[in-house]
Amino acid sequence: MLMFTKGPKALAFVAVIGAGVLLAGVSGRAQLASERFSMVKAMTFDVFGTVVDWRSSLISEGQALSTRFGFEVDWAQFADDWRGGYGPAMQRVRSGELPWMRIDDLHRMILDDLIPKHGLTPLGEEDRDNFNRAWHRLQPWPDSVSGLTRLKTRFVLSTLSNGNVALLVNMAKHSGLPWDVVLSSELAKHYKPDPEVYLTAADLLGLEPEEVMMVAAHKGDLRAAAALGLKTAYVPRPTEYGPDREIDITPDPTFDIVATDFNDLADKLGIR
């Protein structure tokens, strides 16, 4: 039987014991997670919004144009409009209205439509092309590089984005993203969340779907992956659409892991 007396030393002893129990609990949970996902060999990542902050990056690129040309443009609205055209443009391809197109080409099509609406007609072809390549220069979230570097010590890391291969390779070089491989919906000639994208990725990695974990900030992406047997990690990015827009980040209980960022994801998988 242990006897405790009141006083500073006794309280300090209890605090130390309590901290030890807490650390043991955290370590134990990480160990259980590590064992639970021992079959996972690779992690595939959504990129736009999950790994990189597209909105702030596009705003910054637009502001640079304003400095050069004197444009008076609401660049936050422009970024939202550019991104907002992405889904409808993909649907036009899916419906057969448009032939298969790389995301670079879809982005340019949307940009050409937005230019007169936002008073950017003075932009010449070279500047338009360079502005379209802003999507190749998107900046990562603060935790992305450090978290991916930790996850890379255990898993094969790959993109799995609707962005085309050249875009993703250039982005990785620009932002120092430590991918082992760059996979894209372009390789399946489908866009997420079509099943072909996820299954093609697993096949190219030489893995079964259950040996792959899809990581994304978007629930629809994860639900589509889970339906095919992939493991799922939900990493919400509450400010993806700006600080003033509220988005539902309530996790789906069917997701295998929920993390606040990539370093938290590494912690929960027992990676130090």
Predicted regions located by residue number:
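Bacterial N-terminal signal peptides
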Residues: 12-24
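Active-site neighborhood of HAD-like aspartate-dependent phosphohydrolases
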Residues: 35-84, 117
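A metal-dependent, Asp-based hydrolase signature
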Residues: 69-70, 79-129
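Substrate-recognition element of Asp-dependent hydrolases with the DxDx(T/V) motif
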Residues: 125-174, 182-185
